[in-house]
Amino acid sequence: MAVGMAAPHATYASDPARSRGRLFDEPPSKTRSAFRRDCDRVIHSTAFRRLKHKTQVFVYHEGDHYRTRLTHTLEVAQIARALARQLGLDEDLTEALALAHDLGHPPFGHAGERALDACLDGYGGFDHNAQTLRIVTLLEHRYPDFDGLNLTWETLEGVVKHNGPLADRACNAIGRYQRRGIPVGIADFNRRHDLELWSFASLEAQVAAIADDIAYDAHDIDDGLRAGLFAVDDLKAMPLTAAMIADIARRHPLLDDHRRGAALVRGLISHLITAVVSEAERRLADARPQSVDEVRRHGQALIAFPPAAAEAEALIKAFLKQRMYRHPRVMRVMGEAETIVRDLFARYRDDPAALPAEWLPEDGESRELDAERARRIGNFIAGMTDRFAITEHRRLFDSTPELR
């Protein structure tokens, strides 16, 4: 076996040697598996570097120690690899999916996504998973023979389906997409390169998705404590974190609040990882899938929180929503961020010359706002960092919110 070609440990794991391939054929690497190459391509992409200056919750200039999309992504990848290793899955595919999962987020996090979605209403809307797919299949320009990163089918599938199927067998949208339909970027690509939107994704993709949940919960608690939006003792309102805080107090009665918070975050991550592994092992023992295709056809997720952990995790999300995401300070800044995104879209719509040359309408292309030009503007704004969006707004407008 070649260097770097570690085989998956379990029959239900994805195997790079049996990948369904890439949209554009390439010779295999002598030193890296197909999934390792995907992982490396994501890391070296321009979109990945931009995550450094994209918001997780707090805008980039609010503090050097708050999480950005990049630090969050690295933390998701660490948790995902730990889960994959424990379950005998392909760690490289798992890591590639964890590293790619947030590439499509616009500046200012979910506030930016809401604003762009409103701006693109009538032109297909904006969905960050669809934008991730656009980035890795079209918008990255690093290779002479193709646009995008030419990732394997398995990585593209996981990018799109990590939260479950998007459609039924008749191609009718289901779940979160039932009302508005499958995002146009996903639907268009799926016609070229069938991602089987009706099936579940691989276990590696399911692991990356649940690692995202674990990282969000634990690290947003950490950032919320650091920002002073709530205190460690406020977390006693939930049974799981209350028990952990009590255990920390028993073992370290004189610990200061900073270290108590850090111990709580570590303990929460460890607890949720252990719970997921236990539940996954139980489900896999019951289902006994003999291949990754049997995983896809199983009809339900095999990676999940057990009921008690799912209830605890839902309570944590509800706490964070009330005490952090809807905190007046955060809401004020995010409202101003939405204004910046809407203003930029309107200016580029009304004055195409305000766009950089490479984003201008091509010769012969209509300068009226149609779906193609609206998407071009949306792609440009979605690729901005928080810092660039603020700087660009200052260039184009007399007054720009301070976002503080």
Swiss-Prot record:
Belongs to the dGTPase family. Type 2 subfamily. Keywords: Hydrolase. CDD domains: HDc (cd00077). Residues 22-32 have a biased composition (Basic and acidic residues). GO terms for biological process: dGTP catabolic process. It holds the Pfam family HD. The keyword Hydrolase applies. Residues 69-217 form the HD domain. GO terms for molecular function: dGTPase activity. PANTHER family: DEOXYGUANOSINETRIPHOSPHATE TRIPHOSPHOHYDROLASE-LIKE PROTEIN, DEOXYNUCLEOSIDE TRIPHOSPHATE TRIPHOSPHOHYDROLASE. Residues 1-32 are annotated as: Disordered. It comes from Nitrobacter hamburgensis (strain DSM 10229 / NCIMB 13809 / X14). InterPro entries: dGTPase, dGTPase-like, dNTPase_2, HD/PDEase_dom, HD_domain, PHydrolase_assoc_dom. This is Deoxyguanosinetriphosphate triphosphohydrolase-like protein.
